[in-house]
Amino acid sequence: MKGGGIINKFNNKLGFILTAVGSAVGMANVWGFPYKLQEGGLIFLIFYLLFIALFSYVGLSSEFAIGRAADAGTVGSYEKAYEKYNRRVGTIVSIPPLIGLILLTIGYSVVIAYIFKALVDSLTGRIMTSDINIWYRDLSERAYSVWAYHLIIIILTALTTIGSAKTLEKSSKFMMPIFFLFFVIITLVIMTLDGASDGYRYMFRLDLSKLSISTLVSAMGQAFFSLSITGSAMMICGAYLKKDEDIVHSSKITGLLDTVASMVAALVMIPSVIVFDMENAQGPGLLFQILPTVLKNIPGGRLIAIILYTAVLFAGITSLQIMIEVVVESLNYKLKNLNRKITLVLLSAFIFIIGINMEEIKIWGPFMDIISIYIIPISAVIGAISWFYVLDKKTLVDEINQGAKKTYGDTWYWIGKYFYTPLVVIICILTIII
């Protein structure tokens, strides 16, 4: 595929949904959601489910719709939105979301290299015999500590992205079912631990003191980021979707499976922390310090560690695939004579060269904070405003109804324009100022 007009499409609805879920499921599910659920309990969960339903219904479906309408990824989607003014304006508007995604891809590749290192050390048994604090410091505080793992991840991701929609679909159909299966297996093991029931009771406790604006905002932000509605990534999934597929229904299924992924992660993480009276944590500390410590102290911990890090690795790779695919497609869309394979190789080399210089967590952490606090929320606002305030209403609604089993009209559009988009702006402002 060169330039606009995507030829490769997903073979079927399952391939599309699993690829979209693969893009959405990532570290926000694995280490963000469990932490916030443990903090907020049932009140947080209720708010979260309401926002997932809303954001899937209008936010996710709008990004899928503009991608399919434009038959293109990020750049082409913005050009489509602004074509009644000037497509060049759309090109300019697409630059911040695209740059944000490139930077996110670089940072994301680092944490996936961490995960791959943890998996290898689980296979060799090193993670079970080492002092976890020393092991983690060696992993995160030493320059170029995971460069070899980093290189392998970049190569594997490039190989599974090389065939565009076809290889993305095949790899997602393989990796995402394994992700869910492995987490279910681990959940069943965790349930057998003495005290696990206390963890689940705490996890689903009804604490009315959590009925607050802060819990509401926390749930809203978590739902938003969990679905990867960033104004950049999900349009490519829509571009690869056939015209006879129901976008809104597929968006609902994607949101449901993303929620299942978050819940199974929480069912593993929270009881583990409670049973062993570990300090509540989120981010790398949960995955690379607390969980290894827990796994060292339970029967079959090494095997569970292998299963766990394999599942998380697969979730990370499927997200990284879409990020890289978005950038490759956008470059090929504008530079029509640029060979796709050459683009993929050059981009992969760029991500690796920049990424290996960020493997120390003191560099990686602030870098990812800047992206997640400032760049991604602003990009999401740009996207929401572009779809609901700039793009012609008829174009968006017609695309939503293409292949739909029921007709969506003014109500769907009104919710997107006057409810969803203001919420995205609120999330952006609160993320920046809090």
Give names to the regions the model predicted.
Residues 1-31, 59-64, 68-92, 242-246, ...:
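Membrane-interface "cap" regions at the ends of multi-pass membrane proteins
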Residues 2, 111-141, 240-245, 249, ...:
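Helix-loop-helix connectors at the membrane interface of multi-pass transporters/channels
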Residues 6, 34-39, 74-96, 109-165, ...:
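Inter-helical loop and helix-membrane interface segments of multi-pass membrane transporters/permeases
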Residues 10, 14, 169, 173-317:
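Membrane-embedded translocation segments of transport machinery
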Residues 14-17, 23, 146-148, 257-263, ...:
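Loop-to-transmembrane helix boundary motifs in multi-pass membrane proteins
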Residues 27-40, 156-169, 188-201, 208-213, ...:
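Transmembrane helix-loop junctions in multi-pass membrane proteins
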Residues 34-48, 67-71, 167-175, 249, ...:
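Transmembrane helix-loop boundary segments of multi-pass membrane transporters
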Residues 93-98, 328, 334-348, 369-428, ...:
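C-terminal membrane-solvent junction of multi-pass transporters and transport-like membrane proteins
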